[in-house]
């Protein structure tokens, strides 16, 4: 079986030769070809070379267009890139440091906005070069993560209490953008869209259920309607929201090393495909 066939067989409940291997590789992939991570994160040509080389070297079953956030800089966020560490949002100059700016924020077009368009180019190239052998995965930011990129993570955490109506309006914007961007990635060649929502593990179960879950569900449903399989990735401990995650109906749910796989299985149910939960420091 090819890697693509292996992943799709698993998701469709069909026989397969062995479980697929589909880790998230970003800085690791850049390292494999000697590229600076800051370049990998903004240049689809470097990303494609790194993804293909890494997948073929280690026998991974997918290639992914995941880099740093592409939506935020195209919405005016001040993003700092580094050679050998992940990006950072300049919260002192957050694009939505003033809440009034949300009403003036224009929805960028993924087909022409510089950063999102670069990812589309990368996915099209991945599809052309290895799309028959490897599953091609795109990526969008989830509502909590995307909102934090625009507002600043610390400010957003206060907004949940100080101005919940603003949070809902902001989530409306970022989810609409996520669906639009995800649809464009499917058209470019992605068969699966990952949803990265790391900040969702920081808000606690009450706020997650009130604010985050409904918008994650809308995003997942929108990506499914676009023809994509959906993979949810929430970093950190999701122990207290696992049952809610199981109700999102994602095709794959990533399980971080902070969450026992047995607990994830118990809470999400017997049919949910789970991916993880290797500790990249201790185990690797």
What are these regions (language model features)?
Residues 26-30, 69-72:
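Short active-site-proximal "capping" loops at secondary-structure junctions
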Residues 40-69:
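Segments that shape or occlude catalytic/ligand-binding pockets
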Residues 65-75, 138-145:
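Short, glycine/charge-rich beta-strand/loop segments that flank catalytic centers
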Residues 69-111, 132-133:
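A contiguous, low-structure linker/loop signature
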